[in-house]
């Protein structure tokens, strides 16, 4: 879900924080991409003309594999090196949200069945997309595909967005890539959005700079986390009557969530704002401040030659893809992943940093106990096909 209304607030109060780029201008960058969010997008967007998911002759869904293969090729062709980060175990506080999502999917499934009988094609398509869920099998197949492509894979102990942010903070990648704005709440210095969108959408890449966002909002990191929780996050019920404008006003007026909650408790129903009886915001804040992640210095990322025979076996023989297209895709991977990229021009200049309006408060780093990809073994936690190519190309 991300953070409700945050993009609009940043556009209004911190416009310098948001820049748009053509994908080709990001050559030389390494990016940690939220895999689960990307796979979800592919399952929704990569469809047949009738709106149904792509399948092979055996009736197996292939939308996620088709999307992942060709969108990753596009990213690599533009000189970007992606690493895909998969979700681990969700925080306990998130279980309520996940349960409600399941209920909504079941409702959409029932409405979809009714639409097949009495509704239009558009109704059926709409309800079908609302029932989409990324399954364990989807994740396993995508990890297998990425390993065969020579793309690094990380399985986070918990939230993928938090792990993406950790790798960006630790200098393993330049940016985190996700549609979820809570990646910023996990303290990602740079967030790329729309990176895995279809080229046909002609949607530019949106780059959001956390430092500029904090300066524009005139907040420190602790206050920013409070604002995001108040706007509405994955861990708590939203407060009725609180929208983006009122959330920003409350945080500025009371300095943080502690003062806001005290005010709302003492003035129940004030201006229609009603805080739930059970609203453990302190627990939610701890998840954002000290997420369960693999420390960046224990993760190495390596991009290697694709396993062409393995790709043909998996995509062509098992999943029914076109062999010629798969082989051509593998050639592109080999060419672009292992070519010596021209250095970025901005790497030759030192930029004098602007004075901070409000410095971000330090965010602690919890050492995660999550598992790493099965291929990852060694003195350090190695991910996918890994060695020493870990620093971002500035």
Curated annotation (Swiss-Prot):
Residues annotated as binding DNA: 47, 71, 159, 232, 234
Stretches for region Interaction with PCNA: 341-349
Matches recorded under Pfam families: XPG_I (PF00867), XPG_N (PF00752)
Biological process annotations from GO: base-excision repair; DNA replication, removal of RNA primer
InterPro entries: 5-3_exonuclease_C_sf (IPR036279), Flap_endonuc (IPR023426), HhH2 (IPR008918), PIN-like_dom_sf (IPR029060), XPG-I_dom (IPR006086), XPG/Rad2 (IPR006084), XPG_CS (IPR019974), XPG_DNA_repair_N (IPR006085)
Chain sites annotated for binding Mg(2+) 2: 180, 182, 234
Compartments, record wording: Nucleus, Nucleolus; Nucleus, Nucleoplasm; Mitochondrion
Enzyme's top EC category: hydrolase
Principal subcellular localization: nucleus
Chain segments carrying region N-domain: 1-105
Job of this protein: Structure-specific nuclease with 5'-flap endonuclease and 5'-3' exonuclease activities involved in DNA replication and repair. During DNA replication, cleaves the 5'-overhanging flap structure that is generated by displacement synthesis when DNA polymerase encounters the 5'-end of a downstream Okazaki fragment. It enters the flap from the 5'-end and then tracks to cleave the flap base, leaving a nick for ligation. Also involved in the long patch base excision repair (LP-BER) pathway, by cleaving within the apurinic/apyrimidinic (AP) site-terminated flap.
Protein name, as recorded: Flap endonuclease 1-A
Name of encoding gene: FEN11
